[in-house]
Amino acid sequence: MTRVPRGYIARRRRTKMRSFASNFRGAHLRLNRMITQQVRRAFVSSHRDRGRQKRDFRRLWITRINAATRVYNVFNSYSKLIHNLSKKELILNRKMLAQVAVLNPNNLYTISNKIRTIN
Protein backbone atom coordinates (compact mmCIF):
# COMPACT_ATOMS: atom_id res chain seq x y z
CA MET A 1 0.00 0.00 0.00
CA THR A 2 1.37 3.37 -0.93
CA ARG A 3 2.04 6.06 1.59
CA VAL A 4 -0.18 9.10 1.32
CA PRO A 5 1.61 12.26 2.43
CA ARG A 6 -0.78 14.44 4.37
CA GLY A 7 -1.13 17.95 3.06
CA TYR A 8 -1.39 21.28 4.78
CA ILE A 9 -4.98 20.64 5.93
CA ALA A 10 -4.00 18.04 8.55
CA ARG A 11 -1.11 20.22 9.70
CA ARG A 12 -3.46 23.19 9.98
CA ARG A 13 -5.91 21.12 12.05
CA ARG A 14 -3.14 19.99 14.41
CA THR A 15 -1.73 23.48 14.86
CA LYS A 16 -5.22 24.72 15.65
CA MET A 17 -5.52 22.06 18.36
CA ARG A 18 -2.05 22.97 19.62
CA SER A 19 -3.11 26.58 19.99
CA PHE A 20 -5.94 25.45 22.30
CA ALA A 21 -3.49 23.33 24.32
CA SER A 22 -0.84 26.01 24.73
CA ASN A 23 -1.17 26.08 28.54
CA PHE A 24 -1.09 22.32 29.05
CA ARG A 25 1.91 20.44 30.48
CA GLY A 26 3.90 17.37 29.54
CA ALA A 27 2.51 14.94 26.97
CA HIS A 28 -0.74 16.91 26.87
CA LEU A 29 1.25 19.67 25.22
CA ARG A 30 3.49 17.59 22.96
CA LEU A 31 1.65 14.55 21.58
CA ASN A 32 -1.06 15.10 18.99
CA ARG A 33 -3.39 12.35 20.16
CA MET A 34 -3.17 13.48 23.77
CA ILE A 35 -3.71 17.07 22.69
CA THR A 36 -6.94 16.24 20.86
CA GLN A 37 -8.25 14.18 23.78
CA GLN A 38 -7.44 16.79 26.39
CA VAL A 39 -8.76 19.70 24.34
CA ARG A 40 -12.03 17.85 23.73
CA ARG A 41 -12.27 17.09 27.44
CA ALA A 42 -11.57 20.73 28.30
CA PHE A 43 -14.33 21.90 25.96
CA VAL A 44 -16.78 19.46 27.53
CA SER A 45 -15.87 20.70 31.01
CA SER A 46 -16.18 24.36 30.04
CA HIS A 47 -19.57 23.77 28.43
CA ARG A 48 -20.84 21.91 31.49
CA ASP A 49 -19.47 24.45 33.95
CA ARG A 50 -20.98 27.45 32.20
CA GLY A 51 -24.38 26.13 33.22
CA ARG A 52 -23.14 25.11 36.64
CA GLN A 53 -21.69 28.57 37.28
CA LYS A 54 -25.14 30.13 37.01
CA ARG A 55 -26.54 27.69 39.57
CA ASP A 56 -23.61 28.19 41.93
CA PHE A 57 -23.87 31.97 41.90
CA ARG A 58 -27.61 31.84 42.50
CA ARG A 59 -27.03 29.57 45.52
CA LEU A 60 -24.34 31.96 46.81
CA TRP A 61 -26.63 34.97 46.49
CA ILE A 62 -29.46 33.17 48.27
CA THR A 63 -27.12 32.14 51.09
CA ARG A 64 -25.86 35.70 51.52
CA ILE A 65 -29.35 37.18 51.55
CA ASN A 66 -30.55 34.56 54.04
CA ALA A 67 -27.60 35.20 56.36
CA ALA A 68 -28.09 38.96 56.22
CA THR A 69 -31.82 38.79 56.88
CA ARG A 70 -31.26 36.61 59.93
CA VAL A 71 -28.28 38.54 61.32
CA TYR A 72 -29.83 41.99 60.91
CA ASN A 73 -33.35 40.80 61.87
CA VAL A 74 -34.89 42.13 58.69
CA PHE A 75 -37.15 39.10 58.33
CA ASN A 76 -37.10 35.68 59.93
CA SER A 77 -35.91 34.00 56.76
CA TYR A 78 -34.99 34.47 53.14
CA SER A 79 -38.21 32.91 51.90
CA LYS A 80 -40.36 35.43 53.78
CA LEU A 81 -38.34 38.31 52.38
CA ILE A 82 -38.68 37.07 48.80
CA HIS A 83 -42.37 36.31 49.29
CA ASN A 84 -43.07 39.83 50.56
CA LEU A 85 -41.00 41.38 47.77
CA SER A 86 -43.00 39.56 45.13
CA LYS A 87 -46.28 40.29 46.90
CA LYS A 88 -45.55 44.03 46.95
CA GLU A 89 -44.26 43.83 43.34
CA LEU A 90 -40.83 45.25 44.14
CA ILE A 91 -38.50 44.07 41.41
CA LEU A 92 -35.10 43.31 42.89
CA ASN A 93 -33.19 40.29 41.70
CA ARG A 94 -31.15 38.10 44.00
CA LYS A 95 -27.84 39.44 42.75
CA MET A 96 -28.78 43.00 43.66
CA LEU A 97 -30.16 41.97 47.03
CA ALA A 98 -26.98 40.05 47.84
CA GLN A 99 -24.84 43.07 46.95
CA VAL A 100 -26.98 45.28 49.19
CA ALA A 101 -26.82 42.74 52.01
CA VAL A 102 -23.03 42.47 51.84
CA LEU A 103 -21.98 46.04 51.10
CA ASN A 104 -24.64 48.15 52.82
CA PRO A 105 -26.92 46.35 55.28
CA ASN A 106 -28.63 49.62 56.26
CA ASN A 107 -30.26 49.70 52.85
CA LEU A 108 -31.67 46.26 53.60
CA TYR A 109 -33.61 47.90 56.45
CA THR A 110 -35.00 50.52 54.08
CA ILE A 111 -36.07 47.83 51.63
CA SER A 112 -37.81 45.93 54.42
CA ASN A 113 -39.53 49.13 55.58
CA LYS A 114 -40.76 49.72 52.02
CA ILE A 115 -42.18 46.21 52.00
CA ARG A 116 -43.98 46.74 55.29
CA THR A 117 -45.38 50.21 54.51
CA ILE A 118 -46.70 49.61 50.98
CA ASN A 119 -50.27 48.40 51.11
UniProtKB/Swiss-Prot annotation:
Show the coiled coil region(s). Answer: none
The organism's place on the tree of life at top rank: Eukaryota
* InterPro entries per the UniProt record, alphabetical: Ribosomal_bL20 (IPR005813), RIBOSOMAL_L20_CS (IPR049946), Ribosomal_protein_bL20_C (IPR035566)
Q: Which GO terms describe its molecular function?
A: rRNA binding; structural constituent of ribosome
- KW Ribonucleoprotein (keyword) present: yes
Keywords assigned by UniProt, alphabetized: Chloroplast, Plastid, Ribonucleoprotein, Ribosomal protein, RNA-binding, rRNA-binding
Q: Where in the cell is it found?
A: Plastid, Chloroplast
- TM segment ranges: none
Q: Which Pfam families match?
A: Ribosomal_L20
Its Gene Ontology cellular component terms are: chloroplast; ribonucleoprotein complex; ribosome
Name the Gene Ontology biological process terms.
Answer: ribosomal large subunit assembly; translation
Stored PANTHER family:
39S RIBOSOMAL PROTEIN L20
Q: What's this protein's function?
A: Binds directly to 23S ribosomal RNA and is necessary for the in vitro assembly process of the 50S ribosomal subunit. It is not involved in the protein synthesizing functions of that subunit.
Check the record and name the NCBIfam families matching this protein: rplT_bact (TIGR01032)
**Recorded family membership:** Belongs to the bacterial ribosomal protein bL20 family.
Q: What is this protein called?
A: Large ribosomal subunit protein bL20c
Q: Which gene encodes it?
A: rpl20
